[in-house]
Amino acid sequence: MSNTILQNLPLGQKVGIAFSGGLDTSAALLWMRQKGAVPYAYTANLGQPDEDDYNAIPKKAMAYGAENARLIDCRKQLAQEGIAAIQCGAFHISTGGVTYFNTTPLGRAVTGTMLVAAMKEDDVNIWGDGSTFKGNDIERFYRYGLLTNPNLKIYKPWLDDQFIDELGGRFEMSQFLIANGFDYKMSVEKAYSTDSNMLGATHEAKDLEDLSTGIKIVKPIMGVAFWDESVEIKPEVVTVRFEEGVPVELNGKRFDDVVELFMEANRIGGRHGLGMSDQIENRIIEAKSRGIYEAPGMALFHIAYERLVTGIHNEDTIEQYRINGLRLGRLLYQGRWFDPQALMLRESSQRWVAKAITGEVKLELRRGNDYSILDTVSPNLTYEAERLSMEKVEDAPFDPIDRIGQLTMRNLDVTDTRNKLGIYSEAGLLTAGKDAVVPQLGSK
């Protein structure tokens, strides 16, 4: 493994590059060809909402000197992994109850495995991508690449001093393309960078690194700017149906194609700006970063799924689902979605939680993350109103005498707790005065 990362361009060898068609990868591909490598371009179709023509990207790669260029359709796998994350609640980052749905880590898990698998088919065993040394993706792609191909070598132009010296900035890269006969016009540089896939979009860096810069500078690509009062957003009632943990219907329409299901969920949630959040998070290397996120479809499914979870499962099961979800979310974020410890956690939730989740949830969506749940229907509900009805009911499951017995049994642990508080008070750990929060204990 010591020579896994190549710091210099491997001359005369096949080098696979994850090619987006943007300035960085275009310049890198042309530069590698001119310097003597044999570049192969691989583009992942992840259903990116900001990409208009996927088929044009491989053609562009060929023009820049790729020996071969392939478009890999990753959408179905990405949708399935998104559903798995919903089933497991694999989300560990939230602020004020608003969740980040780990959409970029899910995209990297799919891209990192499927592109490297495609490279193996072409006998390409060296891989490069555009991730920087300060971010999470460099480690995610490293892990997923080596899991897929243990013989893989990693070459990144952005870690090559020669490439940095010659083409170290956007201006230098654009001039390089122009000098080689390509009519490249630099796009207007935004105040932040955006990365997206079918599950969600990430906006970060540049102006967004300043915490005094709010969400309002972001132009959403998956929905509306719900904070803009000039944007008309009408309340909308939506019904989501799950069968054995899998979303299958939206507003009574059944979707056999999981990709189309997600696209429709994105359209519905996007009309309201549902699923947008502003998060400060810990990167893999423990430094904090800030991101603005969109995930309208994931948010819609998550809300409906968790409503059914709370109506169907008991308290201990829900607790384990949430604890395991936090752990699994962090593993996913770290690029460990297919590691044994993650598979163990996934198995428990996908088998013992998700399989019971069948039913429909009706919601009213308003602006942003403002919504109401209007109805919850499932043949598996353990919620039964008559069990705890405040009205008099026939054949009640328990009566006052039963509750007296249950409360009497509590005397055992109340007595133990009282004794422990006395011990702590005598040890000086608690103050049992008249103004103390701890109840006055009196004599033992």
UniProtKB/Swiss-Prot annotation:
ATP binds at residues 18-26, 44, 130, 132, 137, 195. One of its GO terms (cellular component) is cytoplasm. Pathway: Amino-acid biosynthesis; L-arginine biosynthesis; L-arginine from L-ornithine and carbamoyl phosphate: step 2/3. It holds the Pfam family Arginosuc_synth. It is found in: Cytoplasm. It is an enzyme of class 6 (ligase). Its main location: cytoplasm. L-citrulline binds at residues 100, 136, 140, 193, 202, 204, 281. GO terms for biological process: argininosuccinate metabolic process; L-arginine biosynthetic process; urea cycle. GO terms for molecular function: argininosuccinate synthase activity; ATP binding; protein homodimerization activity. It catalyses: L-citrulline + L-aspartate + ATP = 2-(N(omega)-L-arginino)succinate + AMP + diphosphate + H(+). L-aspartate binds at residues 132, 136-137. Keywords: Amino-acid biosynthesis, Arginine biosynthesis, ATP-binding, Cytoplasm, Ligase, Nucleotide-binding. HAMAP family: Arg_succ_synth_type2. Homotetramer. Belongs to the argininosuccinate synthase family. Type 2 subfamily. PANTHER family: ARGININOSUCCINATE SYNTHASE (PTHR11587:SF2). This is Argininosuccinate synthase. It comes from Mannheimia succiniciproducens (strain KCTC 0769BP / MBEL55E). The gene is argG.
